[in-house]
Structures are given as structure tokens and as C-alpha cells.
């Protein structure tokens, strides 16, 4: 499945919630009618079946993290093999992706921009270049901006925007050095309550 390259707001309207695909700290429901489905007239949302609700939740989470369908299914399989709660394991695996950690640290304004920074070899993990967005970041790993990339205006702008966002407790960032430490995996209570991972587990358990 190809990666979606169309308007980001359309995806958020389709899911009926802000997927945080746009930069900035202003909620997108102030920019568009997020409760209306995409289209000129914003078609009314029909009543979804149980399967439809589960599918929508899976699509929502997949789009938030910018993961393709096959990748997402593989993450679920890995989460199911791990000890503990499968849904919480799934979210931790997604949070541990390098592109997501770069976003959480504020080096990229969006996860898509953060993924691009990784792919363009602008990111170091423990002093070494890593250009794989899905690279699994471990506790106490140090993620930083490569020296020759530190003058990029988009990184500086992203750090300014990040100052206005709530800072994750599981990450420590030195904006001046453009360096951060992934202190630990986030607990489920650290993450958004707007995600219902139990619906995803129910979907894949069928």
C-alpha cells in the first residue's frame, strides 16, 4: 500500500478527530469542520457497525503514526507475542519508532517531517547516523541532530513549536544542543486517552 500524499486535513476529517498530521499547536477543528466527512457538502456520518468502529480506530492509529498497513499488522503480531497487555504493547512499539521519537523530542513539526529527517540522514542515535524511520529506540538512547543539519530552518521552527506543547515525561531534551534522551518507554497512562487500543485488539482477534 502506497503512503498517502494528499491533504492532511482530509484524513483527520475522515476519522472525525485531529490526527496531529499538521504542524502547529492550534487544534485543527478551528481550521475546518472536523465533524463533517470530507467532500464539498461534508456528508453525514452513517452509523457504523461494530466491525466498522474497530476498523476506524485501527485506521486512526495507523495514520497518527504514519505506518503502512503491512507494517501495522506486523507491529500487532509482535505486540501479541510480548508479555502483558497487547494493546498497550502495540502503542509502546509505535512510540519507540525513531521517527516518532524525533517528533516527540520536537526536532520535527510532524511525524511525516520527522520521518523525512531520519531518511535524509539528519539524525544520530548514540552518535551514529540512522536513516531507518522504524528503527527501535531503546531506553537511555541519545537521539540528536547531525551537526551539518543543525542550521536547517525547519528544525529550528519545529523546536519553537514544541516549546508550546506539553513535554513527554519519558523524554528529556536539550533544545540548545539539539539532543534528547529517550529515558524509558511510555506507560499507557502517559499516552492519549483518545486512542482505544482495545478495539484494535478485538479487530485482529477475529
Swiss-Prot record:
It comes from the Bacteria. HAMAP family: Ribosomal_uS4_B (MF_01306_B). PANTHER family: 30S 40S RIBOSOMAL PROTEIN (PTHR11831), SMALL RIBOSOMAL SUBUNIT PROTEIN US4M (PTHR11831:SF4). Part of the 30S ribosomal subunit. Contacts protein S5. The interaction surface between S4 and S5 is involved in control of translational fidelity. The gene is rpsD. One of its GO terms (biological process) is ribosomal small subunit biogenesis. GO terms for molecular function: rRNA binding; structural constituent of ribosome. InterPro entries: Ribosomal_uS4, Ribosomal_uS4_bac-type, Ribosomal_uS4_CS, Ribosomal_uS4_N, S4_RNA-bd, S4_RNA-bd_sf. Residues 96-158 form the S4 RNA-binding domain. It comes from Vibrio atlanticus (strain LGP32) (Vibrio splendidus (strain Mel32)). GO terms for cellular component: small ribosomal subunit. This is Small ribosomal subunit protein uS4.
Amino acid at each position: 500500500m502506497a503512503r498517502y500524499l494528499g491533504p492532511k486535513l482530509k484524513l483527520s476529517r475522515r476519522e472525525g478527530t485531529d490526527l496531529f498530521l499538521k504542524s502547529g499547536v492550534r487544534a485543527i477543528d478551528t481550521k475546518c469542520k472536523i465533524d463533517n466527512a470530507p467532500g464539498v457538502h461534508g456528508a453525514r456520518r452513517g452509523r457504523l457497525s461494530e466491525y466498522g468502529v474497530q476498523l476506524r480506530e485501527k485506521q486512526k492509529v495507523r495514520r497518527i503514526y504514519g505506518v503502512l498497513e503491512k507494517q501495522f499488522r506486523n507491529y500487532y503480531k509482535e505486540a501479541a507475542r510480548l508479555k502483558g497487555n497487547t494493546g498497550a504493547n502495540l502503542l509502546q512499539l509505535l512510540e519507540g519508532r525513531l521517527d516518532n521519537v524525533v517528533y516527540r523530542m520536537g526536532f520535527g513539526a510532524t511525524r511525516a517531517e520527522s520521518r523525512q529527517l531520519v531518511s535524509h540522514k539528519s539524525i544520530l542515535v548514540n552518535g551514529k547516523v540512522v536513516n531507518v524511520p522504524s528503527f527501535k529506540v531503546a531506553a537511555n538512547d541519545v537521539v540528536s541532530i547531525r551537526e551539518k543539519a543543525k542550521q536547517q530552518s525547519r528544525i529550528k521552527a519545529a523546536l519553537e513549536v514544541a516549546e508550546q506543547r506539553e513535554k513527554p515525561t519519558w523524554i528529556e531534551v536539550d533544545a540548545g544542543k539539539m539532543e534528547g534522551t529517550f529515558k524509558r518507554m511510555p506507560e499507557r497512562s502517559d499516552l492519549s486517552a483518545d486512542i482505544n487500543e482495545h478495539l484494535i485488539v478485538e479487530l485482529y482477534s477475529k
